[in-house]
């Protein structure tokens, strides 16, 4: 009985104080909200940085610049417009996540899985994504200029209107992509697999395509001015509407009877000539091993 009375007295003293605190909090609502957002951003970074999970998390607009996510799981998360500049997303799983309009300039994406993710209008300029998986990802109008994508898997990705100028795509898989209107100007595409892709109206001027595989790909109105095609496999490729191609360039490549070229150009058969294969792309650095999985983050907003 004494304990109940004691608690009652404690409440009678505390409730007015709580009411006063609530009133002050209401007056300072804008400042409190700003601080709260900052704390939540730090919490997400701290709690997921080492092998945690945040599946289906709502992180749109969050400031996660410089964050480190190693071996983390963010499947189907929403990061629309998030600030991820300089972030380290190493060996993590972001399959099905939405990075539309996110700023990922200079981010490290080595060995991460972005299968089916959306990067529409995202800024991925100068990112390091060696060995990353972008299979079936939507990178429409994304800025990937200067990005390091050696050995990345972009099979079936949508690159419509994307900017990959100056990107390093050595040994990258670009098979079956839709890259209409994309820019690969000055990009390194040596030993890349571009088979079956749609590169209509793409800009490949001054690109390096040595040892690349362009078989069965289409290049209507694509620009090849000063592009290098040494040992390039163009068997079955449709280059009939390509611009800027010269006989000197085509003579360095090889094709077959199904290769379609602009009028007046001819190609030697790959046949017995044999293709000199480019060396395999360097293996991406192995991501550090993640610690034991943590529980899903309770503090992050979810759908």
Predicted regions located by residue number:
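Tandem repeat scaffolds
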Residues: 2, 8-11, 29-302
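Bacterial N-terminal signal peptides
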Residues: 12-26
């Amino acid at each position: 009985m004494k304990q109940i009375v004691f608690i009652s007295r404690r409440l009678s003293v505390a409730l007015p104080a709580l009411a006063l605190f609530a009133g002050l909090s209401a007056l300072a609502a804008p400042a409190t909200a700003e601080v709260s957002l900052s704390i939540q951003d730090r919490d997400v970074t701290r709690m997921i940085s080492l092998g945690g999970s945040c599946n289906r998390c709502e992180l749109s607009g969050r400031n996660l610049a410089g964050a480190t996510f190693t071996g983390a799981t963010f499947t189907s998360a929403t990061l629309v417009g998030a600030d991820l500049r300089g972030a380290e997303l190493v060996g993590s799983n972001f399959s099905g996540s939405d990075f539309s309009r996110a700023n990922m300039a200079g981010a490290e994406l080595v060995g991460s899985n972005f299968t089916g993710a959306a990067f529409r209008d995202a800024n991925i300029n100068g990112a390091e994504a060696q060995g990353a998986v972008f299979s079936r990802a939507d990178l429409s109008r994304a800025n990937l200029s200067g990005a390091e994508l050696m050995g990345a898997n972009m099979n079936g990705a949508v690159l419509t209107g994307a900017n990959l100028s100056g990107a390093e795509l050595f040994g990258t898989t670009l098979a079956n992509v839709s890259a209409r209107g994309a820019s690969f100007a000055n990009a390194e595409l040596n030993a890349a697999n571009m088979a079956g892709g749609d590169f209509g109206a793409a800009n490949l001027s001054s690109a390096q395509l040595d040892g690349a595989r362009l078989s069965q790909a289409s290049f209507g109105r694509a620009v090849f001015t000063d592009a290098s095609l040494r040992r390039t496999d163009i068997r079955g490729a449709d280059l009939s509407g390509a611009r800027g191609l010269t006989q000197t360039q085509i003579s360095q490549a090889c094709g077959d009877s199904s290769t379609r070229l602009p009028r007046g150009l001819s190609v030697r058969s790959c046949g017995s000539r044999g293709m000199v294969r480019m060396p395999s792309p360097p293996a991406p650095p192995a991501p550090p091993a993640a610690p034991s999985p943590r529980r899903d983050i309770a503090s992050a907003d979810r759908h």
